[in-house]
Amino acid sequence: MKPTLFLLAAGMGSRYGGLKQLDGLGPNGETIMDYSIYDAINAGFGKLVFVIRKDFEQDFREKIISKYEGHIPCELIFQALDNLPEGFTCPAERTKPWGTNHAVMMGADVIQEPFAVINCDDFYGRDSFQVMGKFLSALPEGAKNTYAMVGFRVGNTLSESGTVSRGICGTNADHLLTSVVERTKIQRIDGEVKYIDDNGEWTATPDTTPVSMNFWGFTPDYFAYSKEFFKAFLSDPKNMENLKSEFFIPLMVDKLINDGTATVEVLDTTSKWFGVTYPEDRQSVVDKIQALVDAGEYPAKLF
């Protein structure tokens, strides 16, 4: 069974004005997401599932889904604030979505096969889809608790325009994930990659340190674990009272690896990540995509 690609398209970038998922950056107005989908199809993925906000549906169908019809089957699902487990009610004042893992949970009814999860506004590169596609396609029928994450080398994921947030990964000798620690301020200073640690000190880390760019591989059992843990998350009064609390994928993954329920293999990739974190990054992304097209990595027109 071919794996599915699950695309997180419900969030709007807080730093970069407007819907960056729809920004045309390729030579024929291609979005970053177009390149991800092109790479995924070539890596053996068989279906796309997009999670979006309901009020964005018409725009999304017209501008996005129509492009891929005839190339790969597509499903559209919705992330809503009030889509909570029985017994829980969303605070009336809350406007922020419940986070990336809540978005993933929306796929439970339409995904019965191994699947990868990506952000729509990150350029992950061909090799990262190849390594994830290979991992998911090799899983035996009915596999459970055997997950993966593409580990980008931190030096390949920085922005020239400012600091970035990354999940810094700890791994063991078997390349299994042992921890993901979100660091919100990472940049290159005097040639070294540094981040601000819990004590407010700048700390150096090697260029090759694996980081999570939210490119995960799961099997469908992940949905049931998420549902149970989300109930525990919502049962904590501080998560309900904090209108900006979020149920992130690393939070869920961290729990499953710490209690020994699942393993997460960190897949190394040579791909260089890029994306538009800040408006000033846009031109650099346009130039990088053009360079890949000029080098023959991608056709000038994808679909």
Language-model features, listed with the residues they occupy:
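Phosphate- and divalent-cation-binding pockets in alpha/beta enzyme and binding domains
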Residues: 59-60, 225, 252, 284
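Conserved catalytic-core motifs of eukaryotic protein kinase domains, centered on the activation segment
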Residues: 18-19
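Catalytic beta-strand/loop signature of glycosyltransferases that borders the donor
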Residues: 210, 265-271
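Active-site metal-binding loops of divalent metal-dependent hydrolases
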Residues: 12, 122, 154
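Conserved core of the sugar-phosphate nucleotidyltransferase
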Residues: 126-215, 220
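Conserved N-terminal catalytic core of the sugar/cofactor nucleotidyltransferase
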Residues: 1-10, 27-117, 124-131, 137-138
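A C-terminal functional module that forms or caps the active site or interfaces directly
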Residues: 226-262
